[in-house]
């Protein structure tokens, strides 16, 4: 359990509560969660050691045009890691549902409204793209870059989070490599529901022992934090124990409630080169 799971900032969230579903536009449904909650726990109190974005994909986005004809789209939202807040996912879903029976003049108006409301909730300007289903149909399903570290013949008996599993994981050889795992699983901070993801780790520096890295990632299996918080924890732990000169951590989680969340943190560029979905998304 995370140290801040009982924080007062989480007490009023709709997550884990019985809620009414509104089909009329209502921006007040959005609920922020201060990023400072987990960053204080990670001693990230000053300048951040990374840049990045939380990339959300909205698969259940629909509204009415001025003739009352339903419109459907697939949307993308890029929320800067520097924003004051992350957006709580159930409130995001309820907010999107409030578009369902609301008329908008055109697609641009929908994009503008989403941008305005999500920026206000995050506390910083976000980027929103609204795509037609036809355009999105041509997007390929991709796999992660680099070597998969999952097929190791190792025995694991503990699933309690333990950052120190990375202690001594940095070897002597200098490398630049990309590794990935599909075994990332954590639990929702509030509801304890499982969150399933894949994570790509690109770095330059002392070569990281793959067994130690896999054991570390598997230790998230019973850990309770939001997606974004887990990725920042992975980033800071690798920096602490392995000290690479360059590091990028990019996780892609399976969708829930018509939304998937793909946090990206890096010492290099502030967003990935693409937002293409994986087989489990």
Swiss-Prot record:
Binding of NADPH occurs at: 89-90, 256-257
The UniProt entry, under Gene3D superfamilies, shows: 3.30.1130.10
Source species:
Vibrio atlanticus (strain LGP32) (Vibrio splendidus (strain Mel32))
> Which Gene Ontology molecular function entries are recorded, alphabetically?
preQ1 synthase activity
**Any single GO CC term annotated in Swiss-Prot or TrEMBL for this entry:** cytoplasm
Q: Which residues bind substrate?
A: 87-89, 227-228
Spell out the reaction equation it catalyses. 7-aminomethyl-7-carbaguanine + 2 NADP(+) = 7-cyano-7-deazaguanine + 2 NADPH + 3 H(+)
Pfam families in the cross-refs: QueF, QueF_N
GO biological process terms, alphabetically, are: queuosine biosynthetic process; tRNA modification
Q: Which InterPro entries match?
A: GTP-CH-I_C/QueF, NADPH_dep_7-cyano-7-deazaG_red, QueF, QueF_N, QueF_type2
Signal peptide range in chain numbering: none
Give the protein family.
Belongs to the GTP cyclohydrolase I family. QueF type 2 subfamily.
Recorded protein name is: NADPH-dependent 7-cyano-7-deazaguanine reductase
């Amino acid at each position: 359990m995370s140290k801040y799971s009982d924080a007062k900032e989480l007490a009023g969230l709709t997550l884990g509560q019985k809620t009414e579903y509104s089909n009329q536009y209502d921006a007040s449904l959005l609920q922020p969660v201060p990023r400072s909650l987990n960053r204080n726990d990670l001693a990230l109190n000053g300048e951040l050691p990374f840049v990045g974005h939380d990339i959300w994909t909205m698969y259940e986005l629909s509204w009415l045009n001025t003739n009352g004809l339903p419109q459907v789209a697939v949307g993308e939202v890029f929320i800067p890691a520097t924003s004051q807040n992350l957006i709580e996912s159930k409130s995001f879903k309820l907010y999107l549902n409030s578009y369902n029976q609301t008329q908008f003049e055109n697609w641009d108006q929908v994009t503008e409204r989403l941008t305005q409301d999500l920026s206000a909730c995050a506390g910083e300007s976000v980027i929103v793209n609204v795509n037609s289903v036809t355009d999105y149909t041509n997007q390929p399903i991709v796999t992660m870059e680099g070597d998969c570290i999952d097929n190791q013949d190792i025995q694991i008996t503990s699933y309690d989070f333990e950052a120190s599993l990375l202690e001594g994981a940095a070897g002597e050889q200098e490398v630049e490599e990309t590794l990935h795992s599909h075994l990332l699983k954590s639990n929702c901070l509030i509801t304890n529901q499982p969150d399933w993801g894949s994570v790509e780790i690109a770095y330059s520096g002392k070569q990281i022992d793959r067994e130690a890295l896999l054991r570390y990632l598997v230790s998230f299996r019973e850990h309770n934090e939001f997606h974004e918080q887990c990725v920042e924890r992975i980033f800071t732990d690798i920096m602490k124990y392995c000290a690479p000169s360059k590091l990028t951590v990019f996780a892609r989680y399976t969708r829930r409630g018509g939304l998937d969340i793909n946090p990206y943190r890096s010492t290099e560029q502030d967003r990935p080169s693409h937002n293409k979905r994986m087989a489990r998304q």
